[in-house]
Design a protein with these regions (language model features):
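Flexible, compositionally biased loop and terminal segments
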Residues: 2-302
Length: 302
C-alpha cells in the first residue's frame, strides 16, 4: 500500500493550495486516509457547507438548542483543519442566514456570543496555520462586538496564503443578488457601465464572493434536500452532497467520504459524457483509488 501512495502525484495549478501540516498531532490512520484522498487527484478547490442540525442534535439528547451549537463548533474546528491539511483552497461555511434573525432572541444572542468566542479562541491558531479569514453577508447587522473581532480577524490574517475560510454571516443568496443588481444599476446610471457591458463575469464581480472561485462541492448535513438561499448564483455547477448526519456529528471521516464521492463524479458543464471522457483518461485509476480509500476507512471501523 505504501508503494501505491509513493507512486501517486497530485496535479495542481499554481493557484491551488498545497497540503498543509497543521500544527498538531494526527493519527497514522488519518494520514493514510488523506494520502488516499490526495491520490484521487481530483479534490475540490472550493467546498461550501450548509451546517444544519444543531438544534435537532440537542433535542435528541434533551439538551437546550445552544448545546448543539456549541458542539457544532467542534465540527467547524475539525473540518477547517482537515481542509487545510488536504490543501483545499477555499472553505465557505453558512454560519448565520438573514432568516436566522427570526429565531428566538435568546438563541440569536447565544449564537452571536458563540461566534465571538470562536473567533477569539481560534484566531491565533488559524493565523499560525496560514488560514485567511473572510466574511460575506450584511455584516453591519451583526452586534458591534462581533463586527470588531471579525474585522480584527480579517485584517490580521489578510496576508496569509493558505486556506481561505469564509464565514457567511447575516447572509442570503437573494440579498446578495439584489445588492449586486442595485450596484450595477447605479453604475449604469452614473455612466460607468452600459447595459451591453453586463455579462456573467461582470455580474459575479459585484457579488460579495467576487474574487473567489465558484464552489465545486456543496455539502449539506441533516438530510435536508434544499439549498436554503445559500450562494444561489455561485452554485450553478456545484456538485451537491447531502448526508443525514447532523452537523455536530459531522467530522473529518464523513468529510473524507464526501470528498471521495465528489472525486468519482463526472462534471460535465453542459458537455456530453463522451466529451468529458475524451478529455480525461484517469477515471479508472480514480475508481481504483476510491476503492482503496473505502478499504482504509472500513479497516478503521473494524
Amino acid at each position: 500500500m505504501g508503494t501505491i501512495f509513493a507512486s501517486c502525484t497530485v496535479n495542481r495549478t499554481p493557484m491551488d493550495r498545497q497540503p498543509h501540516q497543521w500544527l498538531c498531532e494526527r493519527s497514522s490512520e488519518d494520514v493514510e486516509c488523506q494520502r488516499a484522498l490526495l491520490a484521487l487527484e481530483r479534490l475540490p478547490r472550493h467546498v461550501a457547507i450548509i451546517m444544519d442540525g444543531n438544534g435537532r442534535w440537542a433535542t435528541a439528547r434533551n439538551l437546550p438548542r445552544i448545546a448543539g451549537h456549541r458542539e457544532g463548533i467542534e465540527s467547524v474546528r475539525d473540518i477547517v483543519k482537515a481542509s487545510a491539511e488536504l490543501g483545499i483552497g477555499y472553505l465557505t461555511l453558512y454560519a448565520f442566514s438573514t432568516e436566522n434573525w427570526k429565531r428566538p432572541e435568546a438563541e440569536v444572542s447565544a449564537l452571536m456570543r458563540l461566534l465571538e468566542y470562536y473567533l477569539r479562541a481560534e484566531l491565533d491558531e488559524l493565523d499560525r496555520n496560514n488560514v485567511r479569514i473572510n466574511a460575506i453577508g450584511k455584516l453591519v447587522a451583526l452586534p458591534k462586538r462581533v463586527q470588531r473581532i471579525l474585522t480584527r480577524a480579517i485584517e490580521r490574517t489578510a496576508g496569509n496564503t493558505g486556506l481561505v475560510l469564509t464565514l457567511a454571516l447575516s447572509y442570503s443568496g437573494r440579498w446578495d443578488i439584489v445588492r449586486a443588481v442595485q450596484m450595477i444599476a447605479l453604475d449604469v446610471r452614473r455612466g460607468k457601465l452600459s447595459p451591453e457591458d453586463i455579462s456573467d463575469e461582470l455580474f459575479g464581480s459585484y457579488l460579495s464572493t467576487a474574487g473567489m472561485p465558484e464552489p465545486d462541492l456543496l455539502i449539506r448535513t441533516s438530510g435536508e434536500l434544499r439549498v436554503s438561499n445559500f450562494l444561489l448564483w455561485e452554485i450553478a455547477y456545484a456538485e451537491l452532497y447531502s448526508t443525514a448526519t447532523l452537523w455536530p456529528d459531522f467530522r473529518r471521516q464523513e468529510y473524507y467520504h464526501a470528498l471521495a464521492d465528489y472525486a468519482r463524479r463526472e462534471r460535465r458543464f453542459g458537455m456530453t459524457s463522451e466529451q468529458v471522457s475524451a478529455s480525461s483518461n484517469s477515471v479508472p485509476y480514480r475508481t481504483y483509488i476510491k476503492e482503496l480509500f473505502d478499504t482504509i476507512v472500513q479497516r478503521r471501523k473494524g
